[in-house]
């Protein structure tokens, strides 16, 4: 996993150039948004259990067959595995958001995910829908527009770009599952 700084250094080194111009401007922006980035990751990690359980409850409400006998989350064991997988996905999305780089998500979470789910008989459409629900909840928390009474204390300013960045990581998960 490379953070934004390491990526710029590796890129400049491979071309035998100094870091300057546009690279410095993007790093300056990354630093300026550092507190917002930390607050966004804190909002996700502090609300992880709610984000994941709401997503799983959402797919169960949308598709009641999932909780019926032979459904994807029928037994307690399957439900626990579904919640665990959701927390793992959210954790790696938060790592990627913190680093400003999706490589940790790609390398440690998404590689072979579709094949694993297929081998286990996990309904990929439902899994992708759960991730989409997590994406929406995360965007609301990051932009501090969630409707829950306890909103996260975040650094003032527009966090829509961070919500979009997190959304792109969730989209990568959805693509890997589908």
Curated annotation (Swiss-Prot):
What is the role of this chain? Light-harvesting photosynthetic bile pigment-protein from the phycobiliprotein complex.
Gene3D superfamilies from the xrefs? Phycocyanins
Superkingdom in the source lineage: Bacteria
List cystine links.
Answer: none
Give one Pfam hit by family name.
Answer: Phycobilisome
- Matches recorded under PANTHER family: C-PHYCOCYANIN BETA SUBUNIT (PTHR34011:SF7), PHYCOBILISOME 32.1 KDA LINKER POLYPEPTIDE, PHYCOCYANIN-ASSOCIATED, ROD 2-RELATED (PTHR34011)
Protein name per UniProt:
C-phycoerythrin class 2 subunit beta
Principal place of residence: membrane
Q: Where in the cell is it found?
A: Cellular thylakoid membrane
Membrane topology, from the record: Peripheral membrane protein
- Binding site residues for (2R,3E)-phycoerythrobilin 2: 159
Q: What family is reported?
A: Belongs to the phycobiliprotein family.
Which processes are annotated in GO (biological process)? photosynthesis
Which keywords does the record carry?
Answer: Antenna complex, Bile pigment, Chromophore, Electron transport, Membrane, Photosynthesis, Phycobilisome, Thylakoid, Transport
Give Gene Ontology CC terms.
Answer: phycobilisome; plasma membrane-derived thylakoid membrane
| Changes after translation | Contains two covalently linked phycoerythrobilin chromophores and one covalently linked phycourobilin chromophore.
**Oligomer status and interactors:** Heterodimer of an alpha and a beta chain.
Q: Where does (2R,3E)-phycoerythrobilin 1 bind?
A: 82
UniProt: phycourobilin binding residues: 50, 61
